[in-house]
């Protein structure tokens, strides 16, 4: 957990990946810092302070989801994104709203489990290597065949075989030590070994996906799994692959799942972030049955956001201190079209601005994961060094902005489409090109994109 970041530091970290949207960054930075402040309070006062949920308003592709996702990643908090339109009112077929909390807990369990695996990794690998030694050079007990019960009872012939057995033990021990050295030195990585692994059984409840009954299926499967023996199967793998499989198995054995569950539920309750996208799609006046159904979903979401207990397979989870970030474009509706009770649960309102040509230029080159950097790295694997002139980058940004204006405005996502079309021929022929360095000029951009961008009928299908 990295809750010690100040709001300014959080904004600076977000600036490395997201261009603009200062208001949204400040809002989430303050929300995160308040969690740190709350953790320092006395318990009686801490219980009274709930997070201030955030409503982000802005068109698609301007960074609403990315701000929330990067914020969660920055502090290592459990984070999930759900779409409000996927939920149905209680009593109808579809996902119930409580599933978002169950998904959050599952994410939290996965995060904690991965952290625990890292802690026991060295010990797990050591035990996996011991199992590999046992497979390559079985111990005398496993090599020995059937023993006569009378011989075991009366000890007849034991003395006569004792010397031979002792010599065999010494020889086998030498072999085991030799194999251990070779394994440590990586000299046996390509050797093929036969190992027994736990078989991954396909779930008979996959058919329940999307029906709202997944939790019932999972609980039933867990109940069955607790008393049904796990199946194993033999697999032939190289030592390198076998070590990975065995290390994973040993790590799972070393982890205390009760400890994982306890920590995961705590993190989900105290640090969890749920991003509810497309909340504008369930807003509307009660003019028809569809809007009434949408209001039903809002009323189902309300107790989750207000604070309630949700039953999960890991136990009851309180939602009182989970941070909810809702987002929507609100083209066809307004935030005031949400039911008043739900509006009141999102006191912080942030409006994200549309992206300009200058924003597109910055998005292409400034973030740590900028698109230009990605394409340069991809083509470098083919031995080709490409560079973009400043004028070419400006031209790409102008075309992306213009296509957004002429067709549907999908924000920064338009740049992905533009860049793919621009470098389509180069990517296709990269393995055959003999040139080591290629410069992308405004003329090249014009040649590849201008004709398509100017033709609205074509651009809406291609770009």
Curated annotation (Swiss-Prot):
- Which GO biological process entries does UniProt record here? protein unfolding; proteolysis involved in protein catabolic process
- Lineage, top-rank taxon, reads Bacteria
Q: Which CDD domains match?
A: RecA-like_HslU
User: Which UniProt keyword terms apply here?
Assistant: ATP-binding, Chaperone, Cytoplasm, Nucleotide-binding
Q: Which residues form the signal peptide?
A: none
| InterPro entries per record | AAA+_ATPase (IPR003593), ATP-dep_Clp_protease_ClpX (IPR050052), ATPase_AAA_core (IPR003959), Clp_ATPase_C (IPR019489), HslU (IPR004491), P-loop_NTPase (IPR027417)
Q: Which residues bind ATP?
A: 19, 61-66, 277, 341, 413
Q: Where is it predominantly found?
A: cytoplasm
Please give the function described in this protein's UniProt entry: ATPase subunit of a proteasome-like degradation complex; this subunit has chaperone activity. The binding of ATP and its subsequent hydrolysis by HslU are essential for unfolding of protein substrates subsequently hydrolyzed by HslV. HslU recognizes the N-terminal part of its protein substrates and unfolds these before they are guided to HslV for hydrolysis.
Share what the entry says about its subunit structure, partners included. A double ring-shaped homohexamer of HslV is capped on each side by a ring-shaped HslU homohexamer. The assembly of the HslU/HslV complex is dependent on binding of ATP.
PANTHER family named in the record: ATP-DEPENDENT CLP PROTEASE ATP-BINDING SUBUNIT CLPX-LIKE, MITOCHONDRIAL-RELATED (PTHR48102), ATP-DEPENDENT PROTEASE ATPASE SUBUNIT HSLU (PTHR48102:SF3)
What does the sequence similarity comment in the record state about its family? Belongs to the ClpX chaperone family. HslU subfamily.
What name does UniProt use for this protein? ATP-dependent protease ATPase subunit HslU
The species this protein belongs to is Bacillus cereus (strain AH187)
């Amino acid at each position: 957990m990295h809750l010690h970041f100040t709001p300014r530091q959080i904004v600076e970290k977000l600036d490395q990946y997201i261009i603009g949207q200062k208001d949204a960054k400040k809002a989430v930075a303050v929300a995160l810092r308040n969690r740190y402040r709350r953790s320092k309070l006395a318990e009686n006062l801490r219980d009274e302070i709930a997070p201030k949920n955030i409503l982000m308003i802005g068109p698609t592709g301007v960074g609403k989801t990315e701000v929330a996702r990067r914020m969660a990643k920055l502090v290592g908090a459990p984070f999930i994104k759900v779409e409000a339109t996927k939920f149905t009112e209680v009593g109808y077929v579809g996902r119930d709203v409580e599933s978002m909390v169950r998904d959050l807990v599952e994410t939290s369990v996965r995060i904690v489990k991965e952290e625990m695996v890292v802690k026991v990794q060295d010990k797990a690998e050591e035990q996996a290597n011991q199992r590999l030694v046992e497979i390559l050079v079985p111990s005398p007990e496993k090599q020995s065949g059937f023993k006569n019960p009378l011989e075991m009872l009366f000890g007849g012939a034991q003395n006569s075989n004792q010397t031979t057995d002792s010599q065999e033990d010494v020889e086998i021990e030498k072999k085991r030590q030799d194999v251990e050295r070779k394994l440590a030195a990586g000299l046996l990585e390509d050797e093929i070994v036969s190992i027994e692994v736990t078989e991954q059984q396909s779930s008979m409840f996959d058919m329940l996906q999307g029906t709202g009954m997944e939790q019932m299926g999972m609980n039933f499967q867990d109940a069955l799994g607790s008393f049904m023996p796990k199946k194993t199967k033999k697999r032939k793998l190289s030592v390198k692959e076998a070590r990975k499989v065995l290390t994973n198995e040993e790590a799972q054995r070393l982890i205390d799942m009760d400890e994982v569950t306890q920590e995961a539920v705590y993190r989900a309750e105290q640090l969890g972030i749920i991003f509810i996208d497309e909340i504008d799609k369930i807003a509307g006046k009660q003019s028809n049955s569809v809007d009434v159904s949408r209001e039903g979903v809002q009323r189902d979401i309300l107790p989750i956001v207000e604070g309630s207990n949700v039953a999960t397979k890991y136990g009851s989870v309180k939602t009182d201190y989970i941070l909810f970030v809702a987002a929507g474009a609100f083209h066809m509706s307004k935030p005031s079209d949400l039911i008043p009770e739900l509006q009141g649960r999102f006191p912080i309102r942030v409006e994200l601005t549309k992206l300009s040509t200058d924003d597109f230029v910055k998005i292409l080159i400034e973030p740590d994961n900028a698109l230009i950097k990605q394409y340069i790295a991809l083509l470098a694997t083919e031995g080709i060094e490409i560079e973009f002139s400043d004028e070419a980058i400006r031209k790409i940004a102008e075309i992306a902005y213009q296509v957004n204006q002429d067709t549907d405005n999908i924000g920064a996502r338009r740049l992905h489409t533009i860049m793919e079309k621009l470098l389509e021929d180069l990517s296709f022929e990269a393995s055959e090109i003999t040139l080591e360095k290629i410069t992308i000029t405004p003329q090249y951009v014009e040649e590849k994109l201008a004709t398509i961008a100017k033709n609205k009928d074509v651009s809406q299908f291609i770009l």
